[in-house]
């Protein structure tokens, strides 16, 4: 009888240990799951130009200049293009547009159309850029040009947006934020001109999608 009693005690101890270790195991699993989620995001800094970046990153002036110049080239390739200066100004405001290089991603037929109407086509000035580490753990930096409208009637007014129209908040350089790694991926080249107000519509749609996604995520976390 004593031996049987001893066996029951051992069984009890195992059962007690299992019940009390389970929450710990779940917590460890949750930590690894969160770590996996974090790997899909990237911390980036927002700068207006290379000088802003250099001031915030002493000793990294060369990297800041390279990232800024690369962002300018990317802006030429991916920024919304307009057939006339007036269309661009209506979207982004006076003093916010420039002539785009003829080779900046546009299809030849659209270049010809723009040249017939005004001699060239137009694009917004790069208002700033995002800068983050290169994917894959590289030693270099990735960058993404940002645009902003000075026209109060535009959905992009006072905001940083990328070439696809995604909104990254107030157009205030010096901020640091977390973005999906896809945000730093190269955007497709612009191959057609945008109609007046077309980019603003894209920004409005993207903002609606972002709010909807944020609401869905909040509801999911809250059960």
Curated annotation (Swiss-Prot):
Residues 178-195 have a biased composition (Low complexity). Residues 178-223 are annotated as: Disordered. Residues 204-223 have a biased composition (Polar residues). InterPro entries: Biofilm_formation_YgiB. Pfam families: DUF1190 (PF06693). Belongs to the UPF0441 family. This is UPF0441 protein YgiB. The gene is ygiB.
